[in-house]
Every structure is written in structure tokens, then in C-alpha cells.
A protein has these predicted regions:
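Long, charged, low-complexity, helical-prone intrinsically disordered regions
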Residues: 1-330
Length: 330
């Protein structure tokens, strides 16, 4: 049945929310939903995870993958921190590399790391006389251009910085263009989301809408995606959806703000759940029967969060009947 309800049911299955993933399936899921992010407002250094999707402790698992340098850190979506498989670094460098605009401080640090690295920020401060507030933005500029690499393999503060090509000698950050990289990653995301709009993909990857829309149109021209409603479906899923009714996910899950389901369509969702009260914001979104239909409003703190209200987009009677179920999820 080619309906949004069946699409949603298949999406929940592909996200491993209907049935949790073992290690091999989890690795494929993580790859398709990369760059992986930490839980929003997490403790410093916590490994990335995909909440409620693994049949094991994926925070511990991804921490181990970080220590083995299977997962590595970079600055990806809008300069934000994320973690990708080291084997995928060239692809994501092509997707996110920003043109390098040298400054006096960035060139000084680049030369110093090349000569003396790996170095931590404290050593750079001591050797250059620069302040941390001068060093950090210069390192971020170099990191976004994939010229240096921050080796965060555990939760410690004392992290070494290397020249990128020293850590990844076989990776050419300029080999893959952004347009080509989008043609590779968008089918992965579409496979997991099943139904994907250009706006969803733009929010997920944090890239210009024009670039994302052009890539999706090209994938449709190639027959990899097909147009449906306001977005696209993977072409291979159309007969599957027409022939099979998938079991829907029933229940309520609380999703943190970096969850992949939240990141798709995040811009519109932020507007819809904007609180008129100063100091109140979304702390979690509520996935109700496979669709985001509510949010927990409050204020983040170190320690227990403030909880102000629970907003729901449900009929009043249904919300009343499911009150305890919703509160348990929160």
C-alpha cells in the first residue's frame, strides 16, 4: 500500500525502532545516518549513539570504535562536531570541506603542528603565546578545511592535533566534489527515511538547499529516486510498499534533539514548537506511533533539566487516554 502510514511503518523498521539492531545491522545504520552526533546536551566526550536502535549498549560500543580509530571526529554540519567511520572520511571531506581562508594565527598553528605535532591546545598556547580564544577559532578554520585533525579517541580533554594528511595519507579531501558526495549519501538517507524531501535532507546534512535539491533531481533523473507527493521515494521501495503492509510502530518514544529523525525537517519543527515563554525550549521531541507529534518544553541545566510543559499534537481525547504512556516516555 503506497500510503504515508505504510511509508512510516517501513521507516521505523529501517531505523531499527520496530526491532533493534545487532552489531552488523547497527554499523550499516550508523553509516547511512552519518555524521553521527552525541546526545544533545550530553556530558563532555560522550561517544555518539543512536538511541533505542541497538540491542546492546551502543555508547560503549562506539566508545570502543573511537579508541580503535574506526570512528573519527570532524567538523561537518554547519561546522558542528560529528563522528564518521575513518574509511568514509574522504566522502565526508568532499561533502563538507570549506575553502581555506588563512589568517596569521591559523598559518602559525598549521606550521607549528606540522613541525612539532601532535600538540594539544595547552602546548600551542605555551609555544606561541596565543590565548585559547585565539587558538580555538584558528583550529576550527583549519579543521573545517580538512587541514588538521583532532584525535578525540576518548573522553579526555587532552587531545592531540595532527596535520590531516599525516593521519589520513591516502585521503584527498578535494578528490570528491560536494555534488558527487551528495549523489552518494542521499540514497543512504532516503533508504532509511523511505520518504525524503529536499528540506528534510537540507536540515539533516546542514548544506545549502540549492545543492541538495539539484542532487535529488539528478538522482530522480537517474531513476534512483522517484517523485512522490512533495518529496521522493527510493525507486526500489515503490513495488515493495505497493505489495506489502508493514507493521506500524505503536507507542511513545522521547527523542533528543540530535536524533536523526529530529534532524530531518528540523527547521520547520523549530518554528512549530517555539515557546513564547522566555527561557523555555524543546528538550525532547515525542515520537508517537512513528511520527513526531509533541515536545517536552523546559530548560537545559547541568543536572536535572527544568520541565515546563508537554506539548502534544493529538486529539484531546487521545491525549487524555495516553497520558500515562506519554509521561512514562518523558
Amino acid at each position: 500500500m503506497l500510503t504515508m502510514e505504510n511509508v512510516t511503518a517501513l521507516r521505523m523498521r529501517r531505523h531499527c525502532l520496530t526491532r533493534r539492531a545487532g552489531a552488523a545491522e547497527y554499523d550499516a545504520l550508523y553509516r547511512d545516518l552519518s555524521p553521527g552526533l552525541n546526545v544533545h546536551w550530553h556530558g563532555f566526550g560522550q561517544p555518539p549513539c543512536l538511541v533505542e536502535r541497538a540491542d546492546f549498549d551502543d555508547v560503549e560500543y562506539n566508545g570502543r570504535r573511537q579508541r580503535q580509530r574506526i570512528l573519527v571526529k570532524g567538523r561537518f554540519q554547519n561546522g558542528n562536531i560529528g563522528f564518521v567511520e575513518a574509511a568514509q572520511m574522504e566522502l565526508f571531506a568532499g561533502l563538507y570541506r570549506r575553502p581555506y581562508k588563512p589568517t596569521e594565527h591559523s598559518e602559525l598553528l598549521r606550521e607549528l603542528i606540522g613541525r612539532e605535532g601532535p600538540l594539544n591546545i595547552e602546548a600551542m598556547k605555551r609555544m606561541t603565546g596565543l590565548l585559547v580564544k585565539q587558538i580555538t577559532p584558528a583550529l576550527h578554520r583549519l579543521q573545517e578545511a580538512f587541514l588538521v585533525f583532532e584525535d578525540q579517541f576518548d573522553g579526555e580533554w587532552d587531545r592531540g592535533w595532527y596535520l590531516f594528511d599525516e593521519m589520513f595519507p591516502d585521503v584527498d579531501p578535494a578528490r570528491i566534489s560536494r555534488a558527487e558526495a551528495l549523489l552518494r549519501v542521499l540514497p543512504r538517507l532516503a533508504h532509511r527515511q523511505v520518504y525524503l524531501t529536499a528540506a528534510d535532507a537540507k536540515d539533516f546534512y546542514g548544506l545549502p538547499a540549492r545543492d541538495v535539491a539539484a542532487a535529488m533531481e539528478e538522482l530522480a533523473r537517474q531513476g534512483i529516486l522517484v517523485r512522490w507527493r512533495e518529496g521522493y521515494l527510493p525507486a526500489q521501495d515503490v513495488p515493495l510498499l505497493q505489495a506489502q503492509a508493514f507493521e506500524p510502530l505503536r507507542g511513545v518514544l522521547a527523542l533528543h534533539r540530535n536524533d536523526p529523525l529530529v534532524r530531518c525537517g528540523e527547521s520547520a519543527r523549530k518554528e512549530r514548537y517555539k515557546s513564547p515563554e522566555k527561557g523555555s525550549e524543546v528538550t525532547q521531541y515525542l515520537l508517537v506511533d512513528g511520527v513526531i507529534r509533541g515536545a517536552v518544553m523546559g530548560h537545559f541545566r547541568y543536572g536535572p533539566y527544568d520541565l515546563h510543559a508537554v506539548w502534544l499534537e493529538l486529539p484531546e481525547q487521545e491525549a487524555a487516554v495516553r497520558r500515562d504512556e506519554i509521561l512514562r516516555a518523558v
